[in-house]
Amino acid sequence: MKNASRIFKGPLIWILLCIGLIIVFLQFAGSGNGYKDIPTSEAVSIINSSKKLDSVTLTDGDQVIKITENENKKYRSYWVGNQSDQLVDRLNDRVKAKTLKSWQGENPGQSIWKALLINFLPFVIILLFFLWAMNAAQGMGGRGGVMGFGKSKAKVGSKDTPKSTFADVAGCQEAIDELQEIREFLAEPAKFQRVGAKIPKGVLLYGPPGTGKTLLARAVAGEAGVPFFSISGSDFVEMFVGVGASRVRDLFEQAKEAAPAIIFIDEIDAVGRHRGAGMGGGHDEREQTLNQLLVEMDGFDVHGGVILIAATNRPDVLDPALLRPGRFDRQIAVEAPDLDGRLKILKVHAHGKPMADDVDLASIARRTPGMTGADLANVLNEAALLTARANLPVIGNSELDEAIDRVIAGPQKKTRLMNQHERLVTAYHEGGHALVAAAMPGTDPVQKITILPRGRALGYTMVMPDSDKYSQTRSELLDSMAYMMGGRAAEELIFHDPSTGASNDIEKATKVARALVTQYGLSARVGTVQLGSGDTEPFLGMTAGQQRDYSDETAKIIDDEVRELLENAHQEAFDCLDANREVLDELVRQLFARETLSKAEVADIFKPLKRWPERGAFTGSDKRVPSSIPPVKPPQIAGVDEDAPEVGAPRRGVIAPPTPEPGGDLPGDNPGEWEPPSDWQPPSVGGGKSPEPPSPTHPGEGPQPPSNGNPWGPPRS
């Protein structure tokens, strides 16, 4: 409907309508006066007959024959070729025979109006078209007009624009506080000028995708009470040279005229990347645009009252001149929300969605660590879609569980049929991941195991921490590598012929091992040094611009260390599965019976599990001996019970995001009936053989340590 009204408002439709009316008028003007059109042959027959005729008129030029038999019978036709000579002779004969009163020939020529119309109509049409094009260029210069490619494409917020407020934003309170202060700057500038404070010229919002950067900007637009100009970074660069800089100038001119005002540039990294990179040189179009942006923000001629808010996912590629104080005075990180933030986000998005009485949003928040606001909104939307698909009145826990699985791993492949052997291999593969994760002390809890195909996986083991973790220890990294290799080790142990299903596990484990050696300085042989430059060329991709800053000999040492770490993790996983073969078989039997096992069901199966001990101390050198003095006790926090039992979730960092992957420890459950000594070492790294569990009738009479004081080999390292 809007497109139709836009078409009828334009002049083009009226021009075409006028031309059509003129053609119709000329058509009807040339006909009429009561004459009936007849074929040429019939007209010639009438003239050659002996009927009495009142008059005949031959009009040259148009070659028209008009025959009047009487007042009620008038005919019109046309002659062709040289018929006129024959017609004239016949008409003269009829006049002599007195069967025709008279005839006349006419050669009137064209009328002056018709001649003018035919000669000048094409020029009139061309002139009207150019007038329309120029009018469109002036009226739509900023919206893609012919002459308006240098105009800004910014959208200006109006009263009719749907508004978001800070009440619609949750999970990033620090960013909200900073942006609310920007709103106060614009509303009450005297309050800040009284103490000598200056209004910030720019605010940069950066963080992972889906954390709410654009939503924060919309909230500022909804509450600022000043004109709000929004534009994407990619809108500045077009096919014409200089368009980007022209649009920057036009954008700031519009904002200055409407000051105080706010400009929001989304994805500013499209124009704000490092200058001098890539193949464009100093005359690259993006560089001209960036230079103009730098001048407008803090150049020679700057007027106050305009605040620039920008958002990006990659602050590392932005030009340093853009980030300095005086341009982007504030740089606000918008990270993935913590537990409390996720709960608030779920409450915001649950508004208007009917929930069952037993739905606990706090439980959903605990089960979704690492998810962004967009992920959580997608979870609730998927749950609502599943509820509507099943024609249910309210959203229940089962729909929310399925929604979480769909967001993490994709929809279930109900039509994919696997034979029993493939299902058995998948069950042992996922069971190997889960068992090794539960046996290692530094892994995350196993939340769910399934052998139902979902997404691109034949099955998956969901491993997530019970609380938010922001770092990882060396022991946790090594344990995570062991559970990543658990699936491959299980296939080798059981089927003696591993499959290709562990390719993604090997990829993840290799990344962890290489980061452990080259980034984190956690290899005793390489030392505490970062190898490999992390700087990248903005126009050459993520890693194409990286340079190796170490020798070939060091590269060989790195490769050897990575291989050794992977081999140790692989062997630890194999030994762990071998020592817990009965538990692994029971887990597979339960997977075949139920197809999906929850956290509580897995904990029940793993009660007799033989768990691996903690790793020994690591300092990277024999010269650095760790202290035996324990750390100080942190101060008491009001409202926190220091003596309350801790939730058994080990620390977890950014290495393994909350995606379906193998592994996990089970917090809060009782240990198995047998555990090796705390300093026991698996045979894979030089330790002794797995000791037998003590006899239940004679507790404490298990195998005794050797007399040399080294009970079961060197501690885990």
UniProtKB/Swiss-Prot annotation:
Residues 691-717 have a biased composition (Pro residues). GO terms for cellular component: plasma membrane. Residues 31-111 are extracellular. It is found in: Cell membrane. Residues 1-9, 133-717 are cytoplasmic. Its cofactor is Zn(2+). Its EC number is 3.4.24.-. It is a multi-pass membrane protein. GO terms for biological process: protein catabolic process; proteolysis. Disulfide bonds: none annotated. Acts as a processive, ATP-dependent zinc metallopeptidase for both cytoplasmic and membrane proteins. Plays a role in the quality control of integral membrane proteins. Homohexamer. NCBIfam families: FtsH_fam. In the central section; belongs to the AAA ATPase family. In the C-terminal section; belongs to the peptidase M41 family. This is ATP-dependent zinc metalloprotease FtsH. It comes from Cutibacterium acnes (strain SK137). The gene is ftsH.
